Design a protein with these regions (language model features):
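Short Pro-Cys-Gly-centered "Cys-loop" motif that presents a nucleophilic cysteine in a tight turn
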Residues: 1-51, 63-281
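Short beta-strand->loop micro-motif that forms the acidic, two-metal-ion catalytic signature
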Residues: 55-63
Length: 281
């Protein structure tokens, strides 16, 4: 029987969205710091974090209430800078799953990054089973005035004075990422390396599972909001004012762009009958 784990969660946004919310270095710094600040606000530990141009993934540690608070604060902070971003928060049940999900997040850059994941600048870095040496160019948050901190981090919250930031103003990984819990999870360097090398078919299956969970997590209200936005863009009217043919076209677009799957929830959100979706080829 597999060993169970508690209070570990996979939090992520949609990797198939058409736009690029985290495009620039400034966008990534803001998003990175937002994860750190949201976790500190909610009393949640971050185990691993990766930010790509289109989405982010992290593994967090905390009880249900704290992780829900983390998700809410993070969504609010990102909404101040980007378009609305939907997050999924799935519990991790076993130690084996925790290791696999950790490596999925850690390796997430490999679809487009040609070096080892520990070298990816917008990932956790080489902080696990390694020494943590500060760079002379880095600074303690406590060295900045409260006014400077607000300008850099856009929060009134008092952040830990010992946290370190780099020349971009980004909070360093080993200041807020709980590498100790990760090392306890894997136990040894040998185990960490073994999980780092994932079979391609296993990674594809996990990616499909994660995307399926994302699609299933969307509420009817969320799908209807998106459907109305597409409908207004297409014909200047909301869903309630257009015919079934137009609604089906909107459904086809949302399915094609990976926003939703063929489901009763999508049909209900777009004011269709479940059988109507069978008309889509």
């Amino acid at each position: 029987m597999e060993e169970e784990v508690k209070d570990i969660w996979h939090v992520y946004s949609d990797g198939t969205r058409a736009d690029i919310p985290f495009d620039t270095t400034e966008d990534k710094v803001y998003t990175w710091n937002s994860v750190a600040i949201s976790a500190e606000t909610a009393g949640v530990k971050v185990l691993v974090l990766t930010i790509n141009d289109t989405h982010l993934h992290c593994l967090t540690k905390g009880d249900t209430e704290r992780v829900a608070h983390f998700k809410k604060v993070l969504r609010q902070r990102l909404a101040n800078r980007f378009t609305r971003i939907h997050f999924v928060c799935n519990p991790v049940r076993t130690r084996k799953e925790a290791k696999a999900k950790f490596m999925y997040v850690y390796r997430n850059c490999l679809d487009f990054y040609k070096k080892l994941p520990g070298e990816y600048p917008w990932g956790s870095g080489n902080i696990y089973f390694s020494e943590h040496n500060s760079n002379p160019a880095d600074h303690r948050i406590g060295d900045y005035s409260l006014r400077e901190q607000y300008r850099m981090f856009r929060t009134r919250m008092k952040l830990p004075e010992g946290w370190m930031v780099d020349t971009y103003g980004r909070i360093l990984s080993d200041s807020f990422i709980d590498y100790v819990s990760v090392e306890q999870l894997f136990v040894s360097v040998r185990s960490f390396i073994a999980f780092l090398y994932v079979r391609r078919e296993d990674e594809v299956a996990l990616k499909q599972e994660i995307h399926r969970n994302y699609l299933e997590s969307r509420s009817i209200q969320d799908l209807r909001r998106i459907g109305n936005e597409y409908c207004v863009q297409a014909c200047g009217k909301t869903l309630v004012k257009v015919n079934v043919r137009v609604r089906l076209a909107i459904a086809a677009t949302m399915i094609r762009e990976g926003i939703a799957g063929r489901s009763a929830s999508l049909a209900k959100a777009l004011l269709l009958k479940p059988d109507d979706l069978t008309l889509l080829i």
